Amino acid sequence: MDVNPTLIFLKVPAQNAISTTFPYTGDPPYSHGTGTGYTMDTVNRTHQYSEKGKWTTNTETGAPQLNPIDGPLPEDNEPSGYAQTDCVLEAMAFLEESHPGIFENSCLETMEAVQQTRVDKLTQGRQTYDWTLNRNQPAATALANTIEVFRSNGLTANESGRLIDFLKDVMESMDKEEMEITTHFQRKRRVRDNMTKKMVTQRTIGKKKQRLNKRSYLIRALTLNTMTKDAERGKLRRRAIATPGMQIRGFVYFVETLARSICEKLEQSGLPVGGNEKKAKLANVVRKMMTNSQDTELSFTITGDNTKWNENQNPRMFLAMITYITRNQPEWFRNVLSIAPLMFSNKMARLGKGYMFESKSMKLRTQIPAEMLASIDLKYFNDSTRKKIEKIRPLLIDGTASLSPGMMMGMFNMLSTVLGVSILNLGQKRYTKTTYWWDGLQSSDDFALIVNAPNHEGIQAGVDRFYRTCKLVGINMSKKKSYINRTGTFEFTSFFYRYGFVANFSMELPSFGVSGINESADMSIGVTVIKNNMINNDLGPATAQMALQLFIKDYRYTYRCHRGDTQIQTRRSFELKKLWEQTRSKAGLLVSDGGPNLYNIRNLHIPEVCLKWELMDEDYQGRLCNPLNPFVSHKEIESVNNAVVMPAHGPAKSMEYDAVATTHSWIPKRNRSILNTSQRGILEDEQMYQKCCNLFEKFFPSSSYRRPVGISSMVEAMVSRARIDARIDFESGRIKKEEFAEIMKICSTIEELKRQK
């Protein structure tokens, strides 16, 4: 279907066409190879921004550390990280003055959370640096390994399952003279394959015990592993992101809980809300500024951009903020919250995989691991890499670089937002004490600043004052990348505001299409995405109808399930034609079985099986939804599933869709090749967890299934539950006396085994 693209714009106001300029169609760029260079860039840049600070040496690890706090006041417009403690504290005090009781209340909420949070909170999240294996692992596995090592080193506070007790273990582990860990290693040997008679490499996985002295353990506990950020659109250069280990994560979680609680109470904060709620919150601030700038005042808005937000922030500043926010709170609470910034002040950045070299004859490839960068001859490297390595060398310890200043990406989003809002808060007339005043919006490093004044000079003065105030707390507004406009037109976190928010539809483009989970889920997710965009993103009825047709077309090509009466030949067409011919009510066939599409924009909320149920032949119904059919997925039927959809920017978000279990909701089997790698042990652990959890849920069906709170273990809980259920069943005559006796005997045996263990 050919469309002349210029026709689209005939009647569209310019601001609505903004979304067509976004780089969101097609595949996003991914990084290949090693992230070592990007990480070195980050470390070197961060030190450059703070270069006039004081150097000290960490007594425990021997790492050189740069402290820029209370450094020289800037004399030019270059970005710098010299935050002034007293300025930050004063900004906090004024924030509290404008919002009486805000810190007090947030502390109380957080204290409650600290008492109640379970350690399994840390299993959420993707890749995590696993310090026991010195590489990334899924969060659940990294946590399990950490707890296992703690246990074998005599740390057991964590048995109760509260996060705070796990953190006590972390603190104790740092005082130990040595920690014993189990590491995995691979042995490779060449053997002859019996079948093919060729030589093959056989890998076996070994486990060995290793002792870490206090210094090595501390370095690992303070290490952030680095990777390259993938799928970033609109940028030519890749950049490094960090993933912290389990020792840091729990402490960060509580700090962010406190900061989140504060952000929720601040009208200028774009976090932690999202979507329509965020738009409403922002529109309020704009409305306030426009209403108050009567005919006598001018109002201008800056679409702001900060230079290297993370690299100029400083954990020592966050420590000062937390010290102030929690000043009237109990000692233990203040201690728990100050550990995260302390650990970040002493953090180490792992340089990643290192460099790959190839000889000119292309016969040889060799990997230079990051650990060797400290000693290798630099003649092998090109100029730019050589400069990087020379610069970073004084900071290297065991393949990690000491990185005291700066925060890595995405660690303290909420807390840094509080800092940003505290500067926006200073724009009230009672603080500026002149004719200009400002307000704005802050969401992590993104901001919009609205300045009101009687004339242009006043606006300029207001912007200058804001700019300089930011400099005092280590925030560097970029004069090159920020632009100013009459209030009413600006952009904030990719929301475009023009007398109200304009839908930036292009951002949703990547989530249209076929997800590739299975036929059932893909159909459901596809129509749900279209439905959601009609609700939230100004997707009009005509466009939605077209999107639906394109989706169905895409779906049929993906699963080769063209209509039974089509001429298109695919691998499946023979079977589908046969089905089509022997089906009486053809409208009842699912699209994935070669049926027609009955969706239109009015019925997108109904799962396809329900939509067509009345139209189906009886024997088709029986095959499709028969629990004895081996192809029907045997998961309990959840009425709602979660899919991960990729919006164009920001993290993948979870989206709910209706799920009906049929023969089409198959779950693909896992790739076998993992079984031959060092990941195999991890896989076995995961399966064991899975089995335990499934067993537990059998004993505590979802109606009564709350996470076990209290001190009994899962086994004890299941045994006592089994006894209670057995007694009830016996007394009501559902089971015989012999069965009851057998259950009791099994329970006693389990308890006995647990005691012996």
Swiss-Prot record:
A motif (Nuclear localization signal) lies at residues 187-195, 203-216. It is found in: Host nucleus; Host cytoplasm. The keyword Transferase applies. Pfam families: Flu_PB1. Phosphorylated by host PRKCA. One of its GO terms (biological process) is viral RNA genome replication. The keyword Phosphoprotein applies. It comes from the Viruses. It catalyses: RNA(n) + a ribonucleoside 5'-triphosphate = RNA(n+1) + diphosphate. GO terms for molecular function: nucleotide binding; RNA binding; RNA-directed RNA polymerase activity. Keywords: Eukaryotic host gene expression shutoff by virus, Eukaryotic host transcription shutoff by virus, Host cytoplasm, Host gene expression shutoff by virus, Host nucleus, Host-virus interaction, Inhibition of host RNA polymerase II by virus, Nucleotide-binding, Nucleotidyltransferase, Phosphoprotein, RNA-directed RNA polymerase, Transferase, Viral RNA replication, Viral transcription. Residues 286-483 form the RdRp catalytic domain. Its EC number is 2.7.7.48. Coiled coil: none annotated. Residues 249-256 are annotated as: Promoter-binding site. GO terms for cellular component: host cell cytoplasm; host cell nucleus. RNA-dependent RNA polymerase which is responsible for replication and transcription of virus RNA segments. The transcription of viral mRNAs occurs by a unique mechanism called cap-snatching. 5' methylated caps of cellular mRNAs are cleaved after 10-13 nucleotides by PA. In turn, these short capped RNAs are used as primers by PB1 for transcription of viral mRNAs. During virus replication, PB1 initiates RNA synthesis and copy vRNA into complementary RNA (cRNA) which in turn serves as a template for the production of more vRNAs. Belongs to the influenza viruses polymerase PB1 family. Influenza RNA polymerase is composed of three subunits: PB1, PB2 and PA. Interacts (via N-terminus) with PA (via C-terminus). Interacts (via C-terminus) with PB2 (via N-terminus); this interaction is essential for transcription initiation. HAMAP family: INFV_RDRP. This is RNA-directed RNA polymerase catalytic subunit. It comes from Influenza A virus (strain A/Turkey/Ontario/6118/1968 H8N4).
